[in-house]
């Protein structure tokens, strides 16, 4: 690839994750949410058929969490297959097709989104959701 093509693709990806105005900045000059969106853009640069996310919002300030989740919702709406480890249950309810609920390193429940959020089978999942979801 030529430099011009690489720069063009990079800018298009930064635009896709909403941080094109920060293209000239170094990582230390970006917020945690912006750094996470750069990481998503880097992943997208490989034209993947699926993306894996391990707690993508865990180290972020509460105000930055939605910036990252909004990008991930958009990716899901565009058809990107994603496997996401998260405690963000509202996000999971919005974009998941299937939920695997882990408890103490073991699968406690494996269900379709509607079943998991509607009527979880395991007592542990019921307890977790009652504490985390705001009805």
Residues covered by each model-derived region:
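Conserved ABC ATPase signature
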Residues: 26-30, 34
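Hydrophobic anchor residue at the start of the ABC signature
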Residues: 40
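A short, proline-enriched helix->beta-strand linker immediately N-terminal to the Walker B motif
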Residues: 45-49
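Catalytic Walker B motif of ABC-type/P-loop ATPase nucleotide-binding domains
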Residues: 51-54
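H-loop/switch region of ABC-family ATPase nucleotide-binding domains
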Residues: 86-87
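A short, surface-exposed alpha-helical micro-motif characterized by mixed small hydrophobic
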Residues: 92-94
């Amino acid at each position: 690839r030529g430099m011009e093509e690489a720069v063009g693709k990079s800018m298009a990806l930064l635009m896709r994750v909403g941080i094109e105005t920060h293209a000239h900045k170094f990582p230390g000059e970006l917020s945690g949410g912006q750094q996470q969106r750069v990481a998503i853009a880097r992943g997208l640069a490989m034209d993947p058929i699926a993306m894996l996310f391990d707690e993508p919002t865990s180290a972020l300030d509460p105000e930055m969490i939605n910036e990252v989740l909004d990008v991930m919702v958009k990716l899901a709406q565009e058809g990107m297959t994603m496997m996401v480890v998260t405690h963000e249950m509202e996000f999971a309810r919005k974009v998941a097709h299937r939920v695997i609920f882990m408890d103490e390193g073991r699968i406690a429940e494996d269900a379709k989104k509607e079943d998991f959020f509607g009527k979880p089978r395991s007592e542990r999942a019921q307890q977790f959701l009652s504490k985390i979801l705001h009805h």
